[in-house]
Amino acid sequence: MCFGRVGAAKQDAGHGIIEPHDFWQGFEPAGAGVPAAFKDRYPATLPDGRVLNLPIRALGDSGEGIASLILTQCSFAVEEALATVLADRLRPAAPDVVVGVPTLGLPLARAVAQKLGHSRYVALGTSPKFWYDDALSVGLSSITSPEAQKRLFVDPRMLPPRKKRQ
């Protein structure tokens, strides 16, 4: 896999230039074609055929990379479309609750919960509050910052009521 300079405009033969600030801002129309090789972007295709180009980020000096979606930097139209697709896929499972992982998963979880008709969602956190219970936390690491060891907490007040045994 080949990576360009971070922050440089990207061009793929026959597919034009995507400036760094243009990623996640809109979709290519269905049938527009996608680049054959994934050098600088990955064409994520939605069920309706539209394509969201995701920049490929180098993973250190490994020669490997990941396709990146930063929801807090995408346009409202992209967030809306992704929430619709995810809600449509989740609807048959009839989830009782939607849980969002900080920070980048929170906007999507909120939008998906709304589309599913929920009155709320559960936002997990990485900053412990004095009323949190360590038993309701798990270790957390990230592919983008593997050295940072954090904990992921759920606010005990956000747990659904326990059903009584009969």
Residue ranges and their predicted role:
Residues P95-P102:
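Short glycine-rich phosphate-binding loop at a beta-alpha junction
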Residues L104-P107, P128-F130:
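Short, catalytically relevant binding-site loops at active-site mouths
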